[in-house]
Swiss-Prot record:
<keyword id="KW-0547">Nucleotide-binding</keyword>
<feature type="region of interest" description="Disordered">
    <location>
        <begin position="121"/>
        <end position="141"/>
    </location>
</feature>
<feature type="binding site">
    <location>
        <position position="246"/>
    </location>
    <ligand>
        <name>ATP</name>
    </ligand>
</feature>
<dbReference type="InterPro" id="IPR001412">
    <property type="entry name" value="aa-tRNA-synth_I_CS"/>
</dbReference>
<dbReference type="InterPro" id="IPR020058">
    <property type="entry name" value="Glu/Gln-tRNA-synth_Ib_cat-dom"/>
</dbReference>
<dbReference type="InterPro" id="IPR014729">
    <property type="entry name" value="Rossmann-like_a/b/a_fold"/>
</dbReference>
<dbReference type="GO" id="GO:0004818">
    <property type="term" value="F:glutamate-tRNA ligase activity"/>
</dbReference>
<dbReference type="InterPro" id="IPR008925">
    <property type="entry name" value="aa_tRNA-synth_I_cd-bd_sf"/>
</dbReference>
<comment type="similarity">
    <text>Belongs to the class-I aminoacyl-tRNA synthetase family. Glutamate--tRNA ligase type 1 subfamily.</text>
</comment>
<dbReference type="InterPro" id="IPR004527">
    <property type="entry name" value="Glu-tRNA-ligase_bac/mito"/>
</dbReference>
<dbReference type="InterPro" id="IPR020751">
    <property type="entry name" value="aa-tRNA-synth_I_codon-bd_sub2"/>
</dbReference>
<dbReference type="GO" id="GO:0005829">
    <property type="term" value="C:cytosol"/>
</dbReference>
<comment type="subunit">
    <text>Monomer.</text>
</comment>
<protein>
    <recommendedName>
        <fullName>Glutamate--tRNA ligase</fullName>
        <ecNumber>6.1.1.17</ecNumber>
    </recommendedName>
</protein>
<dbReference type="InterPro" id="IPR000924">
    <property type="entry name" value="Glu/Gln-tRNA-synth"/>
</dbReference>
<keyword id="KW-0030">Aminoacyl-tRNA synthetase</keyword>
<dbReference type="Pfam" id="PF00749">
    <property type="entry name" value="tRNA-synt_1c"/>
</dbReference>
Amino acid sequence: MTRPVRTRFAPSPTGFIHLGNIRSALYPWAFARKMKGTFVLRIEDTDVERSSKEAVDAILEGMEWLGLDFDEGPIYQMQRMDRYREVLAQMLEKGLAYPCYMSAEELDALRERQRAAGLKPRYDGTWRPEPGKVLPEPPPGVKPVLRFRNPLTGTVAWDDAVKGRVEISNEELDDLVIARPDGTPIYNFCVVVDDMDMGITHVIRGDDHVNNTPRQINILRALGGEPPVYAHLPTVLNEQGEKMSKRHGAMSVMAYRDAGYLPEAVVNYLARLGWSHGDAEIFSREQFVEWFDLEHLGKSPAQYDHNKLNWLNAHYIKEADNARLAALAKPFLAALAIDDAALAAGPALEAVIALMKDRATTVKEIAEGAAMFYRVPAPDADALAQHVSDAVRPALADLAAALKAADWTKEAISAALKATLAAHKLKMPQLAMPVRLLVAGTTHTPSIDAVLALFDRDVVVSRIEAALA
């Protein structure tokens, strides 16, 4: 009988989490949801010096923002130390592990000799018990590490869902340290115990873990477990072709939220960053879960493309509910010194959003465009001199008079503009540009009739007339 699917995301909380990291959560999440399975969040915090609560909070916040809900967890490795020590004791008792008293200095010297002889640097098994072998006397006062007794012959093989068949000779692997002298278990050991105890059936992770896999499989089999299905994802590269990392300028996941990206756009973009469903570029979260499979994971490194993300985000902004966008825009407006009182005194924010969103790539851009409706304009003096010339002033005066009498609708405003243009033999930019500057403070706006219709009539007329006084 096939076991129910159980996947996991197992980040180390040692820094911020970027798009390359969170992709290793998205795919196992999607696979678990597709297969009606269980998605486990495990925090691998055994690196006590580098781990932090702030990094854990960033992981949880990023997952919540993207909607990557987990069924079990977060499970912290540091809270499972008793279990690891229990398994270590069992391994010692069964001869699956042994104490090794070789010091770091001795190991370094051994490796130097091996390199000089043209050999691969590796532990030579000095303290490995064998039938008939006489072990050295343990040095006094030295606490040993524990090493896993790796098979000496045969191969470790697995059918990777991304890389295909992988085979590693056991002769290539030395006896891995699985516990430090103070008894603290090592990462590769903890991972195996966790995956076994948690019944993980599919491990979907970055291919920087490929070299760990044969060691983990050997430990797992020694403990009587069966390896999960492995899918090692190729690296995510930045736009310069380097591995995505904080050092190479990667943004944290939450920085995308703070820059005005929508979570559905980021999920859609991440989904395509190493997986495909035919030529589909835009799809909902529900479609992604329905379509996701391991067979269509990419085999080559995926390169981050900021313009592609912007294109997707612009699409989702156009599709988004105006009330939702208004709520998202408020913090950005507040950062522009536009408070609730200013918003209440101006046009309905949702109506402004409806006008501005088709021109925006991010919610931040929407807010920057919307700001003109809620502040007193301060047009550039050079722009005023260029556009509000003596030649256009009579047309501006006639337009102000026409707007006083017109119905306050986009259509009526458009008619007033066209009538003024015809009467003064002007082209639209000759009139629209100065009106934009005087009313909104900028020449960059959507259609002038739509913009004016959102302002209060008295505001529009008074701002035009003030420039003519």
